[in-house]
Every structure is written in C-alpha cells, then in structure tokens.
A protein has these predicted regions:
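Non-heme Fe(II)/2-oxoglutarate
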Residues: 1-82
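Catalytic core of non-heme Fe(II) oxygenases with the double-stranded beta-helix
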Residues: 57-173
Length: 173
C-alpha cells in the first residue's frame, strides 16, 4: 500500500498560528473530557471540542460551533474542501512514558475522495504515527494531510509541554 502523506510547515501566517494557540489555551475555549480516545474503553483519555459536524445527531447538531470562526475559518479557507464532514480539536496531556499506546484507526470509512488533515497547534515531542511506520512530529503551525482510509494514531508527548493540541479536519475534495 502506497502512503501519500504530505506535510506543510508554516501553513498559516505566524500571527494567526499564535492567535489559535493563545485562544485554545485560554479560558475562552472549553475542553470537554473524554474517558476514551478512539474507541470506547480503549484505556486512553483526552479533551476535545467538536468545531464542526455534518451530522444532525452529533453533539453540536449540524454545522459550526460558536468557536469555528476564531479557530477554523482560515484553516478551512486555505485547505479549500469540497465538503467538510467533521472538525474536532483534541488535547492530550503529558504522559510519563510511551506506554500509553493509542490505537490505529481511521476517522471515517468508505468516503470517496475523503481526506484527513491534522493541524498541529503547538510543538512537543508527540505526533502522529501511520500504519506504515511513518511518524509526523507535532510542530506548531504544521499541517499534515493524507487519504482518509490511512490508519493513523496519536503518539502522546512525554516532554515538558503541558499538552499536545491538534485540530483534526475530515473532508472531501
């Protein structure tokens, strides 16, 4: 299986990247605790905030959350998706070791022309690992994009960063 994973460094201008980091780490941006990361009872936990969902039955209903414009608008404008399925911010906290192994997964299955982009809000020694062994390090203002059917997983950080923050964007093009 051929993996086409693209990385773009300095995806947004520096001021916008810093604004997103400052806003998402302020008291103005809520994080909701989840006692699983990928699958129910997977032994991992994280915080998240769904910023956009195309499904009526989802937590925020259909459409944009009130945080969408401040956090996502410029990202989406630059990515230029045909249709957005879901945008979710994820925050994982520091772990002592890499013993916390997040499971490989796909965000959606059977989506024609589906892509996933992960925008790294901050820098730390965590990242994203792919089924083929490729590792993308969490670096502020980097965007990694790959076909939605590629299995990937969170690699938690162990350095002195308080959190690993990403914005996960699922869409078609």
């Amino acid at each position: 299986m051929s993996y086409e994973v693209s990385e773009v460094i300095n995806f947004l201008d520096r001021d916008k990247s810093q604004f997103i980091l400052d806003y998402m780490t302020s008291l103005k941006f809520p994080w909701l605790y989840m006692n699983c990361s990928t699958y129910e009872n997977d032994g991992n936990n994280m915080f998240s905030n769904v910023l956009y969902s195309a499904w009526k039955g989802h937590v925020i209903g259909q459409g944009k959350s009130k945080y969408y414009d401040k956090v996502c608008k410029e990202l989406v404008d630059k990515i230029k998706p045909l249709d957005i399925l879901k945008i979710k911010a994820n925050l994982t906290t520091n772990v002592d070791t890499y013993k916390n192994v997040f499971p490989l997964h796909t965000d959606f299955e059977n989506v024609k022309n589906g892509l996933t982009s992960i925008y790294y809000v901050n820098t730390n020694n965590g990242g994203t690992a792919f089924e083929n062994g490729k590792f993308v390090k969490s670096e502020q203002n980097k965007l990694v994009t790959f076909p939605m059917h590629f299995k990937h997983r969170t690699v938690p950080h162990t350095d002195f960063s308080y959190a690993r923050i990403v914005i996960n964007i699922n869409y078609t093009r």
